[in-house]
């Protein structure tokens, strides 16, 4: 076709409806895709890698999680160090740190042999996990502000929905890739505990994260600089902060030790763990809007009470299934409860709605939720340490009984919330 002009890429109509016409959002969305897949790859093998290759025992797993969660606890101070940076630059820094962390895990896996329990190896792996976690936590808040800034003013919510869905789909793709990699390696004779599978996964994850960091580096610099939140405590939010303590403590037990139970107690390999993570991600995508509507219809208080009452059963089944059922049946029950925990945890949105209803303005909402995350992380890192010790001396039955008790206390405390606490003119 002589003389024809090169056609400029035209983005889909539904994106034109959401994003401002002058904004080039392709690169930003592409970064989220790459980041999502890389995260899915890492998350899909992380616990098996620690248990089967690095030989991290249950008590040590709590120590690992303590350090991995420290960036979340210190996030408010980390962001304060970058107070002169626009959000786009903070986003680029976060991507670079994640790429460095993933590359470190790949290099470490390339120089060690199978089933190593050497202390220096454990230290290196934890350091690179913390580096990745630091980048991940840095990205969390600015990703949302960038997504909203690129959108038309009245379409900020739709933009957040698009970016969240893209991230979840990337995670699912990463989980399924892990399953495929270990399935193929198994077919050609490699055992689940052979390090070759982890090298392939971390290598692929490194390539994706480096690509994500390079793509992010090409993003247009913006002047957008969201205010770096300070700690905000007000008496009317006391119940919210206490609820966050119970939620964070109970959730941390599941987040840290539930995968380890499946691996050490039931022999789940990376393929099984990745399939479970993928199923959880699909259910989270499908159930989030439904639970959101339930909160609006039934009220945040009813959801706060109901979800934690269900979680009591989930926790007890997780801790005692191997005592009550045959190994095969117990494994199925534990897998179902693993998925249920992920679904029910979506109901923590009710806590955010509670804050919105008793806040006087949007700034108060943002400051309170940010402080709540910090409070959550304080107790999360402590419960991670304590949980590993409890497992090592008293077993998983005691550990998950404590989780059930925390859920029960959460329900009882949520029942004390009164309707008259709400601010009728809340934003």
Q: Language-model segments: what does each one mean?
A:
Residues 46, 138-151, 346-360:
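Intracellular juxtamembrane helix-capping segments at the cytosolic ends
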Residues 302-348:
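C-terminal transmembrane helical hairpin of 12-TM major facilitator-type secondary transporters
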Residues 33, 101, 117-139, 329-346:
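Hydrophobic core of transmembrane alpha-helices in multi-pass small-molecule transporters
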Residues 45-60, 256-273, 355-357:
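Short amphipathic helix-loop junctions that connect adjacent transmembrane helices
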Residues 96-118, 310-327:
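C-terminal ends and interior cores of transmembrane alpha-helices
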Residues 161-179, 373-383:
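Glycine-rich segments within core transmembrane alpha-helices of 12-TM secondary carriers
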Residues 205-225, 413-418:
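C-terminal membrane-cytosol helix-exit motif in multi-pass small-molecule transporters
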Residues 75-88, 182, 287-300, 391-392:
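Helix-to-loop junctions at the C-terminal end of transmembrane segments
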